[in-house]
Amino acid sequence: MGKIKKKGTSGQAKNYITRTQAVRKLQISLPDFRRLCIFKGIYPREPRNKKKASKTSTPNTTFYYTKDIQYLLHEPLLRKFREQKAVAKKIARSLGRGEVGDAARLEKNHAPKLTLDHVIKERYPTFIDALRDLDDALSLLFLFANLPSTAHVPPKTIALCQRLCHEFQHYLITTNSLRKSFLSIKGIYYQATIQGQDIMWLVPYRFVQRVNGDVDYRIMATFVDFYTTLLGFVNFRLYSSIGLRYPPKFDTRSDENGAELAAFTLEGRGVGDAPKAIEAGNTQATTSTNKEVSKEIQAKVDDVIKSAGLDEAKEEPAAETTEESSETIDKFEPAAPEADTLPQPDLSGSEAGSLFAPFTFYISREAPRAPLEFILRAFGCKRIGWDAVLGDGAFTHDETDTRITHQIVDRPQLPESSLPAIPAASKDGSDAVQKVKPGTRIPGRTYVQPQWVWDCINEGKLVRPDLYAPGATLPPHLSPWVKPSRGGYDPKASLAEQEEEGEAELDEDSDEEMEEAANDKKAEAKADVGSESEDEDESVDGGMDVAGTDDDESESEEEEEDFGGFEEEEAASESEDEEEAARTQHQKELEAEAAGLPFSSNGATSDESKKKASQAKKIAAKKRKEEEELERQKMMMSRKKRKLLEKMIYSNKKQSEEAAKLRSKRRKLEKEATK
């Protein structure tokens, strides 16, 4: 006879462990356990059967893999947590004795510091893995970079997040890796392509943030600690890959004056070359004063390069790269006209980086400077000016500068009487920057709203600026990531390109029928009101019921007895339709005669109506034929495939109906606009 298995030694009871058991096994507190799980990427699991996984009768809600907790037993961070707990006890003991100085000394000198370098290397064995997990990191760090400092969010954390985010933005500007952006209700979405990986993150708008008490900032601070370490590693690797020194030089005074991106100076590190400062936002390129290589070493290096023939080898690939860059991007077309649309390759980084290169922009005070500066620089613009109130780092603070080609304005057109007066310049010439009256238009300059910049980068080309003039109704700002599907509504395409055969004519006929029905109802209502008034005037019965004659009763009995079936009713309805058509024809003749026109001039309408009716019949016959063919094909399918086909047809029909509604709405709006 075999051994009886003990309960909880195999199966789900062995594979899963509760959170309370895990905390006891690791011998740490619950907050430290949460931090450790966040750092190591260990998350709760849901067993198939909670009853079998639980060793007790209490309804447990949080389970972990037993192997994950066993893996945490060997984590070096556990020793740091225990050291922190011991130091916290000593600090509490000193504060209890009233020894504040000793407590401050213990906190400053003996508090252990956590290092997450080994955790980053364990979780991301390759650099591509780190790039794939960068979306949430950037979104959270950009969020904390825009938060106000509170007791839960210290200023050091905010400054660290701002510095890391600006360093990452500088890499995107230098390599022209930014691809798309979208203005949404939540904030501004950005998408960049780095080493073939698409990275998307969200940046909140710069409004006054109100920190609520219902948010657990301890958990978010743990994620911030991990993500700052991760982004620091990523920035170092990215800067090293393009030959830049990391971290870049940071000007604290310029940052205090609101320079932001312009407070950083990027330096290249070349073999045998002195580092050169890369223009990051300042108008004048600052040259770095670093250690110069001695002339003797440089001469020896040049001799070695010439003797090895490396300089000639370098020239050949350069010529090849220029030839490759001159080639146009291939366009992939489907083999069949009804096949799926193939994704087309995007613009290269060099083409995207030169979109705004030949222009000089000036950002007005009411426009959002930070996102506009980042996007314009990422797409090749080197000269961006703004008002001195917005901070340092501008190409020019003078709004009347003749080199400015585009000005971004985000205020409506106001009458001159409502505009404020401009103070006169001082006589001693202290006010070097000339003030311009609000609403003034300088000749030779293009004025656009901020949406023009976003639509240009999403389209990959410069769109018409007259559609984005100040005060104009802007075109819809569409998401660049939503691609129109087959049979769906495409707001960018014209109606003629996407509407089905005869859809416009049928829509017009339905609109005309609805208008005619509304007019008929109005006419009937007026006629009813007139007949009621006539009845009131001509009533002689005095409110008494008058008995009908015998002839009337016999006529009603004959009408009830004379029922010849449904065929006679259909014939009668057809005759009534013919009489109605003749009546309308006669009415049109009378209207033409009253207008002094021959009726032949109005005959075109009847011909058009006949053509529309025949076309509608053809379309209906064609649809009926297609449906019959589809039914014949479904008969040859198996039940499983037939059910699947019916689901597909149903979903496609719903999508086409929604698209038809949107096209009809757009058709009406365009018709009203042309009136």
From Swiss-Prot:
CDD domains listed in its UniProt record: BRCT_pescadillo_like
Keywords from the named record: Coiled coil, Nucleus, Ribosome biogenesis, rRNA processing
Compositional bias segments (type: Basic residues): 612-623
GO terms, molecular function: ribonucleoprotein complex binding; RNA binding
Domain BRCT: from-to ranges: 351-470
Biased composition (Acidic residues): 497-517, 531-540, 548-580
GO cellular component, one term: PeBoW complex
Pfam families xrefs: Pescadillo_N
Cell location: Nucleus, Nucleolus; Nucleus, Nucleoplasm
Residue stretches in coiled coil: 567-675
GO biological process: maturation of 5.8S rRNA from tricistronic rRNA transcript (SSU-rRNA, 5.8S rRNA, LSU-rRNA); maturation of LSU-rRNA from tricistronic rRNA transcript (SSU-rRNA, 5.8S rRNA, LSU-rRNA)
Biased composition annotated in UniProt, kind: Basic and acidic residues: 308-317, 518-529, 581-591, 624-634
Gene3D superfamilies: BRCT domain (3.40.50.10190)
Function noted in UniProt: Component of the NOP7 complex, which is required for maturation of the 25S and 5.8S ribosomal RNAs and formation of the 60S ribosome.
Xref: PANTHER family: PESCADILLO - RELATED (PTHR12221), PESCADILLO HOMOLOG (PTHR12221:SF6)
Family under the similarity heading: Belongs to the pescadillo family.
Protein name stated in the entry: Pescadillo homolog
